[in-house]
Amino acid sequence: MGKCRAQSGAMCPSYQVTQEERYSTRGRAHLLHEMVRGEVIKDGWNNKDIADSFEHCLSCKACKTECPTQVDIATYKAEFMAAHYANKRRPVSHYPLAYIGNLLPKLSRFSGLVNMLQSGIIGKLAQHVLGLSSEKGLPKLAPQSFTNWAKKNAFRQDPQFYRFGAQDQPMVVLWADSVNNHYRPQLLQSAVNVLLKSGHQVAVAKQHFCCGRPLYEYGFLAQALKQLTLILDG
């Protein structure tokens, strides 16, 4: 379909950069189709070409909305990656990227040191290990996470939440996602101010919860399910 090879819109970013069919929505769908048929691709879940194709998928889900058939390549990617690496060693880069939600709270405690190290040879080595482009540097951690800001500025607190606003106002729970919590806390701070001015009280969880999406994207399905269960129990 023509939209799979479009030069504008959101679908598909990996094709728009590489101009290679195997990195398009259509290309990935065809590879999976051939895998299921088993005539051309005979090694099933172990096929390295399909794995390479999905490694370049950003899991942005643009195909879910822009593709006429609403194919959800991101979901197929998660399932394929889980099966492909079930019995083989993963690339080293998968682990820090998949577990970034667990790593960031620890790294943010030493944000100044981490940011300084990123600027030198260690930063370049980290980019190489993570498989990131050398054209742009690693993002800088904020001096203070949103959760720490909430701890210092909350109107009151209880065992689970830092709370802002009057107790007789409707309550909104503001989930501090991993990226905004540690890289762009000012966005969440602004969200608190907007909610307060709109007549709400705001609750911010004391414990940081990663949504589990990075785990899911890399095919760590069991770990992602465990993370979601932890969130629901929390």
Question: Which residues make up each language-model segment?
Answer:
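Iron-sulfur cluster-binding cysteine motifs and their immediate structural context
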Residues: 1-34, 62-82
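Iron-sulfur-cluster electron-transfer modules
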Residues: 41-234
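Gly-rich Lys/Arg/Thr-decorated short loops/hinges at beta-loop-alpha junctions or inter-strand turns
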Residues: 31-32, 36, 213-216
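Alpha-helix capping/termination and helix-coil
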Residues: 2, 36-40, 199
